[in-house]
């Protein structure tokens, strides 16, 4: 069984306020054992990071030359394809991922 432990960082807590994903990270488990397969990307949110900088330390300047979600979504979907996703606070992360996929 393939599983992916997944986490995101965002510019804030609410997609209704135009907050965006700024980092996606995942590690692969096969039969509940960690493999060397992982995925990590920083993203340009195309907006300011704001006060969330105090939480994750990712600055506007650091993110300015990173790809947008639109530029990486296919490789991200390939990484998680055919996997059970293990996500702490899944409603939050999945909500943001679904929002990004609609943009």
Model-derived features: positions:
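Conserved non-catalytic scaffold segment of RNase H-like nuclease domains
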Residues: 1-103
